[in-house]
């Protein structure tokens, strides 16, 4: 378990940029440094607004805006936090305004944790987009076609094996790692040929995650 925690801490706290996560890590590193230099006395709403403004400036400087049109004719589905569009026969793109997270940094941390655990459905960050005067992240993910309904008991068994224990409904926690894993219902975890694919995940890092024990 310690080796896993060391690896995850290195992913979240390190500055390396490699492979398809390079743009994702670039943004996460910027947000982490911004958080470290910002006043801890700012309230959450004010800080996230300032964070978004700084993020827009950073995205302009680094040319991180997704300039292609996202057409509603390619719309597939939506949830409270994002909208999903077909990109081609292999991939979908998702727009997410990070409403499930206190800060944009938390959202990008969640993407990095997802990519560590679930490389088969890894997110590739492809840019930001302003939609209706709001900032959205745009990510690409391989499309998963299901062959059967998801067995939530199998999801629970899989997560328990990996030391994520059910707390309520479809929410889990790994207390040793300090990671909360939420909202794992049958639209966020898909099943193809009896293999589970985690396609929409929400990870939160607790203070325990940052400890050295």
Segments from the language model and where they lie:
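Juxta-kinase regulatory segment immediately upstream of eukaryotic protein kinase catalytic domains
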Residues: 1-72
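ATP-binding glycine-rich loop module of kinase domains
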Residues: 38-48, 69-120
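Active-site ExK catalytic segment of metal-dependent nucleases
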Residues: 92-98, 142-144, 200-202
């Amino acid at each position: 378990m310690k080796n896993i925690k060391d690896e995850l801490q290195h992913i979240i706290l390190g500055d390396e940029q490699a492979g398809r996560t390079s743009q994702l890590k670039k943004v996460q590193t910027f947000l982490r440094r911004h958080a470290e230099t910002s006043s801890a006395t700012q309230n959450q709403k004010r800080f996230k607004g300032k964070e978004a403004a700084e993020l827009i400036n950073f995205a302009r400087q680094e040319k991180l805006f997704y300039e292609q049109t996202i057409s509603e004719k390619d719309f597939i589905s939506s949830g409270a936090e994002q909208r999903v569009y077909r990109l081609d026969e292999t991939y979908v793109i998702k727009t997410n305004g990070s409403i499930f997270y206190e800060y944009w940094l938390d959202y990008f941390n969640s993407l990095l944790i997802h990519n560590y655990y679930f490389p088969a459905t890894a997110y590739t960050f492809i840019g930001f987009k302003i939609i209706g005067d709001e900032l959205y992240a745009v990510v690409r993910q391989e499309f998963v076609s299901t062959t059967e309904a998801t067995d939530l008991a199998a999801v629970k068994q899989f997560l328990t094996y990996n030391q994520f224990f059910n707390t309520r409904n479809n929410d889990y926690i790994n207390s040793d790692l300090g990671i909360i894993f939420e909202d794992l219902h049958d639209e966020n975890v898909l099943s193809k040929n009896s293999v589970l694919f985690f396609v929409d995940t929400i990870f939160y890092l607790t203070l325990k995650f940052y400890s050295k024990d």
